[in-house]
Amino acid sequence: MTQTANAAKKTTSTKASAAKEAKVKVTAEEKAVTEVKKPAAKKKSALAFPFTAIVGQEEMKLSLILNIIDPRIGGVLVMGHRGTGKSTTVRALAEVLPLIPRVKGDIYNRTVEQYIEMEAAGKGAPAIKPEDVETELIPVPVVDLPLGATEDRVCGTIDIEKALTSGVKAFEPGLLAQSNRGFLYIDEVNLLDDHLVDVLLDVAASGKNVVEREGISIRHPARFVLVGSGNPEEGELRPQLLDRFGLHARITTINDVAKRVQIVKLRREFDEDPEAFMKKVSREQQKLRKKIVAAQQLLPQVTMDDAVLTDIAKLCMNLGIDGHRGELTITRTAHAYAAWEGDKKVTMKHVREIAGLCLRHRLRKDPLETVDAGEKIDRELAKVLGEAEAAA
């Protein structure tokens, strides 16, 4: 009987121990699930190298800043050697961009006006008052479009089964929805699939994304600044897409020893302690952000005389630029650059600084031409300015 009691006691003890272990295991699993569901803490590796700490490449940085000041410029194409900071610079944008207002929780980043226009259209519902719509401030989205992305990933998908069974348009937004009112970045854009290029061209022209599946149609705003980067040695960009970029920035490997040493030191310091490095440059980051906001506020007050506009038209005509995107882009970019410089009036000094960015990718290609595109633009600018001075 004693043996039986001992056996029962042992069995009970074993069960209790097993139950305790199981309880510990379940608790650990529940804890793990809870931790996964919580927003992950910002890891050191998630921090992007700060914009203001990037050495050199002023042309690329200016192009991006001008597009922040006036998104109507039409984006930036950055072409240059590998490892020159193209992707790093674009991804650093997020930290210096001003916050923008949107309807709270809106997947399309819509303004109150866009929300009211879309939600009330054709529904016969009572008018929505702007003061009834809750808003929030968010960072300007900077979205990556990977080369291997499918059309559904880019444009979004419609759940046909749910739409047919419940009558609800179940739409899963794509990258175009996420990038509305922000930046859409394509690394190695010259290697992008032709079909996706066609999609981007259509959306860039209309400012809207339309997804149609089995007779069901969804449309939403998709206005974004298109930023592409690539290495010209890996392939040319399709002319149709090339012309859609407002500015074209060229970057090369820095050949100044002191600057190269500085780049290595800054990068090592950032990699060792990203948070400390970000604190170190926070004042410069804030200073840049304030200057961008000031330029955005000044932009509507910037004016341009007809004489300057005439010189811009002459420049584009003398260079044989096809169409009128050249004049439009120079005009918008010159206004943005004047605002960036704190000036309320555009002069040919401003035009001279940004003409190469606006026109070099629009010049007709001549295989026998030995003159660099930048030199050609500078030469024609000198002629136009000389004629203007002579006329004066």
UniProtKB/Swiss-Prot annotation:
Annotated Low complexity bias: 1-17
GO function term, MF aspect, one: ATP hydrolysis activity
Gene3D superfamilies named in the record: Magnesium chelatase subunit I, C-Terminal domain (1.10.8.80), P-loop containing nucleotide triphosphate hydrolases (3.40.50.300)
Enzyme class: ligase
Known catalytic reactions: protoporphyrin IX + Mg(2+) + ATP + H2O = Mg-protoporphyrin IX + ADP + phosphate + 3 H(+)
Keywords tagged on the record: ATP-binding, Bacteriochlorophyll biosynthesis, Chlorophyll biosynthesis, Ligase, Nucleotide-binding, Photosynthesis
Binding-site residues for ATP, renumbered to this chain: 80-87
Positions of the UniProt region annotated as Disordered: 1-21
One GO term of the biological process aspect: bacteriochlorophyll biosynthetic process
Pfam family of the protein (one): AAA_lid_2
SMART domains reported in the protein's UniProt record: AAA (SM00382)
Biological pathway: Porphyrin-containing compound metabolism; bacteriochlorophyll biosynthesis
Record-listed E.C. numbers: 6.6.1.1
NCBIfam families registered for this protein in UniProt: BchI-ChlI
PANTHER family assigned to the protein according to its UniProt record, in alphabetical order: MAGNESIUM-CHELATASE SUBUNIT CHLI, MAGNESIUM-CHELATASE SUBUNIT CHLI-2, CHLOROPLASTIC
UniProt record similarity statement: Belongs to the Mg-chelatase subunits D/I family.
Its job: Involved in bacteriochlorophyll biosynthesis; introduces a magnesium ion into protoporphyrin IX to yield Mg-protoporphyrin IX.
This protein's name: Magnesium-chelatase 38 kDa subunit
Species of the source: Chlorobaculum tepidum (strain ATCC 49652 / DSM 12025 / NBRC 103806 / TLS)
Gene designation: bchI
